[in-house]
Regions:
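Intrinsic structural disorder
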Residues: 1, 42-43, 222-224, 228-231, ...
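Alpha-helix boundary/interfacial micro-motifs
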Residues: 26-27, 55, 127, 216, ...
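Short flexible/disordered coil segments
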Residues: 49, 194, 229, 262-264
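PRPP/pyrophosphate-binding module of the type I phosphoribosyltransferase fold
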Residues: 177-254
Length: 265
């Protein structure tokens, strides 16, 4: 796991996240140092503090679950990383849509997916500009003003489709309670998806068991009667149990594991 520290004339503080130290002590990101691989921070009673190497550094292999779930999204490195993960999905998503922005609505779930969603939308805007330039080059701009207006109106339709009523994470709920819980977590916004016409693209920043998706979210979204639903996840696949004591010990429960099995059938 990561470890960060800050030192001044009065304190030595260590925390797993840079943003927590920044908030508590109101310091700049560059004032907070990350403990290097194989290193230890030694604080002596004399007040002398130093970072020393105690083990040979090995290849850096960050825990994806740490960065997806446990890390504060307001840390500058985590924020930009999550946004870039969303941006990487822009091209494959537009490919699935056939570059049709007019009949597509974009949204996200849960609230923590907003950062990745912004990255996705930024990436789609970049593609949109190229599509507009290409379309304009193929028409008589001076004599087709309405067509020009239509082309320039192309933009991703961003809407807040899912609303979370209660702050809860179903993946850390006991198996016996999870099924009852997932049906009461989200509600939807009506009147923004055109029935049987619009494709609905939903960005998720993490899929663990997929319980909430399968038993609640997809069923709720289906009430809006979209032509189809495309679910995209910005997070790396979670294939193995996490080591920090969360109840997720069975590999067969993971959505990524189940999907891999289905692909092999």
């Amino acid at each position: 796991r990561p470890s960060h520290y800050y030192i001044d004339d009065e304190v030595v503080v260590v925390a797993s996240e840079r943003a927590a130290i920044q908030t508590a002590f109101n310091v700049y990101p560059e004032d907070v140092q990350e403990l290097g691989p194989g290193n230890a921070l030694l604080v002596r009673k004399s007040g002398h503090v130093e970072e020393v190497n105690i083990l040979p550094p090995t290849e850096r292999m960050s825990c994806s679950f740490e960065r997806i779930y446990f890390s504060r999204g307001n840390d500058q490195a985590i924020y930009h990383e999550r946004k870039d993960l969303g941006r990487l999905l822009a091209t494959p998503v537009m490919g699935l849509l056939g570059n049709d922005l007019v009949n597509t609505v974009f949204s996200y779930v849960p609230n923590t997916a907003a950062t990745s969603f912004y990255g996705l939308i930024d990436g789609i805007h970049e593609i949109r500009r190229d599509l507009q330039a290409e379309a304009l080059s193929k028409i008589d701009v001076k004599n087709e003003p309405e067509r020009v207006k239509e082309i320039l109106s192309w933009r991703p339709r961003r809407e807040k489709i899912l609303v979370k009523d209660v702050k809860m994470r179903t993946f850390i709920t006991n198996d016996s309670d999870r099924d009852d819980l997932v049906g009461h977590v989200y509600d939807i916004t009506y009147g923004v998806v055109k029935s049987w016409n619009d494709t609905l693209v939903i960005m998720d920043d993490s899929v663990v068991r997929g319980t909430t998706l399968k038993r609640s979210i997809l069923r709720i979204l289906d009430r809006l009667e979209p032509k189809r639903i495309i679910l995209v996840s910005s997070a790396p696949q979670i294939r193995y149990p996490d080591c920090y004591g969360i109840d997720m010990s069975k590999m067969g429960d993971f959505a990524a594991f189940a999907a891999a099995v289905e692909l092999l059938k």
